[in-house]
Amino acid sequence: MFDLNRYQNNIAVITDSKDVFTYSDLHNMQAELFQHIGGRKLIAVLCENKIGALLGYICFINNQIVPMMLDKNINIELLNNLLNEYKPDYLWIPEENDYFTEYKVKCVLCGYKLIEYNNLNDITIFDQLALLLTTSGSTGSPKFVRISYENIISNTSAIISYLNISESEKAITVLPMSYTYGLSVINTHLYIGACIMLTDKKICDKEFWSFFNEFKGTSFSGVPYTYDLLRKMNFKALKVPSLRTMTQAGGKMSNDTSAYFYNYAINTNKTFYIMYGQTEATARISYLPFEYMSQKQGSIGIPVEGGSIELVDENNDKIREASIVGEIIYKGKNVSLGYALNRSDLEKGDENQGILYTGDLAYYDLDNFIFICGRKDSCVK
């Protein structure tokens, strides 16, 4: 999936402690880690925006190992519940984590350790299953979204296309790697041979922007709350000469805040993209082209390349007229395989067959741009 040899001389990662890793470095380190695993397994990963977590993710995806992506600060009771339900073969966790001292440590690399957790599984994992991500609404629940290799490649390619991501990009991490939007930033930049600036620092911290400017970052991504914070900080006064692109997803941004960042982008020769997606679609469903932002304020835009959107009424009939509200049905190769609640569900194949009922209600305007107005049973227009 990630062609580390093709981009071997490119800088892949810069950490906020100023460590620099090329794609060749990543290739060599992930090969070392893989030697300790040796086959298709399930691995629970406690993620943070550090080189160890990223290295593990690259190794697992590139070697047909399935990672369960979890935040490193997950509640221990919830973690134990998930481990009991999914029975992962290994854990890939920060070296300082001391919850699993009774288990064998197979290797330590880049501040992370590989723990042999459970070698008794006889359940076959579906051969197209690549990744398990929690859903936005499943905090406290064992529900994961089952994502395939095709899902990742399809969505990654579409995002690279509409954001015009090239090898020269340097994206700084704002969002958690265990969150579909945060992970999509990593996927797109690794896939094209670009650079990821890894930091766990908050976007409102002075050190975050010092790091961004020192290494000439070109983009950042955020949810509406991120942009509300930046606006309160008087972002327009911040000097970020290397910044090219800002992206937003993860919920509806207020019109005032979107106008603030649109005007900033226009006046400073940058671009700003508002996007819509769900974990069940691997990340992205639609985007609003920058040139339409002033005319189509509040819209989620148009479908990503390779995908299509239909609106259907209560009878599941397709809506063909403007301004009529219906549920968004998305179709594309990035639609996930389905859900999992436990280890045995990892045997399941593609239950969605490329069709996702999003539960979001929306309408078209006369130009076929889409405007969300709520969730099912709560839409007022």
For the regions a language model picked out, list residue spans one by one:
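Conserved AMP-binding/adenylate-forming core of the ANL superfamily
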Residues: 9-37, 50, 77-80, 147-150
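Conserved AMP-binding/adenylate-forming
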Residues: 32-73, 174
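Conserved AMP-binding/adenylation subdomain of ANL enzymes
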Residues: 153-170, 180-219, 304-306
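Gly/Ser/Thr-rich phosphate-binding loop
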Residues: 217-222, 231-295, 308
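Conserved ATP-binding/catalytic segment of the ANL
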Residues: 320-323, 327-381
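ATP-dependent adenylate-forming carboxylate-activation enzymes
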Residues: 47-48, 68-83, 194-215, 226, ...
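Conserved AMP-binding A3 loop
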Residues: 22-23, 130-157
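Conserved pre-ATP/AMP-binding loop-to-beta segment of ANL
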Residues: 6-8, 114-134, 141, 164-170
